[in-house]
Structure formats: C-alpha cells, structure tokens
Amino acid sequence: SRGDFSLDDSWRTFWQDRVREGHHFGSHTYDHLYFVKDGPSGEIFARPQFGPKAGVMSLYNEASYCREIRRVDERFKELTGTGIQKIWRAPGGKTSPRSIRMGSQCGYQHIGWNPAGFLGDELSSQTHPNKMLLDKASSQLQDGDITMAHLGIWSRKDPWAPAVLEQLIINLKGRGFCFATLPK
C-alpha cells in the first residue's frame, strides 16, 4: 500500500532495525525473476516481474543470473551496512537443477519451502479465509518444514499478518515445535 519497493531508501530504518534485532535475510532476486525454463547452452530463460525488463522473458547466463541474486545483497548492504546471509529463494519457487546450480556457483544456497509451508497469504481472502489458512498450516506442518509468507500482501481484504502469524507460532509451539533462523 506504500507504493514503493522494500529496498528503496525509505525502508532504510526498517531494515536497520531488523538487523539490530538479529533477523537473517536472503535474496529473492532484485527484480523478482521468475524461472521459465532451461536455455539451450547452459543458460536459463527467466521473466522479471519488476525493473526495466518487467514481463519480458530473457536469456540469463550464469553471470547475469548471479548479478540478479547478488544485487539484493549489495543494496541491503548500502541500506544497513551489513550483507545478507548467502541464501536465496527463487520467486514462485520455480527452479531447475541448472538455476539452483547457478545460484550455488555464485555463492548462494537455495532455500525452498515445503508444500505444507506455503502459508497462502497471497491467496484471495474470499476463497482462502485466514481461519482456513491457519488451520491448514497448524495441522499440516511437520518437523523441519520451511514456511513462507509475505507480510503485507496488497490483495488480501483480511490481513494475514501479524494476527495469523502470531497464532500459528502459538499453535506450533503447542505441538512442540521450536524455531531457528536460516541457514542452519
């Protein structure tokens, strides 16, 4: 709802506060680059959601894909004085062995999430009310699962965070879960 991007200068204080609190951060690619398919000669085809090539499928070699992952690290360091952890997650969870290898050769470990860990906060509030999402995650998550949620999806009429996130943590702790930061 702010109309800006999370690595804009206006977010500097927010990210500095999160660093001081001890949070860990990874790359999700600078322009939210969706993997499409492997290319013909060791490259990959991907489509950025943002930036000057938004919506245009392009061919990325290892160097250009690495640049896309690393730009987040560089920008985060400009904002906070500290880099991110050397982890990344592909937008939409779309990958191939080649795209994961490209990230790895760039020095970043890919961290996906488990299907049960997709918390559904980007789905429509009308068809996926918060109680349904909470009940599903509370019952289906298993030991070692990695979850994923956006903390501010603009299309949900019934906000997911912080109310559902807090209750989910309470529910999972009630099942004996403990929590850790990545990478581990």
Write out the residue ranges for each language-model feature.
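Structured helix-beta-strand junction loops
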Residues: R20-G22, C106, D143-G144, R175
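Alpha-helical elements of Rossmann-like donor-binding domains used by nucleotide-donor carbohydrate transfer enzymes
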Residues: T13-F14, R71, R98, M132, ...
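His/Asp/Glu-enriched short active-site or ligand-binding loop at hydrolase and phosphoryl-transfer sites
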Residues: K94-Q140, G176-K184
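Catalytic grooves of carbohydrate-active enzymes
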Residues: L134-P183
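Structural recognition of the beta-strand scaffold that forms the well-ordered cores
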Residues: H24-T29, K86-A90, Q109-N114, D145-H150, ...
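Active-site beta->alpha N-cap acidic-glycine motif
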Residues: S1-Y60, S64, E68-K86, W160, ...
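Acidic-and-aromatic substrate-binding clefts and catalytic sites of carbohydrate-active enzymes
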Residues: S1-S10, L33-D38, I87-P97, F118-N130, ...
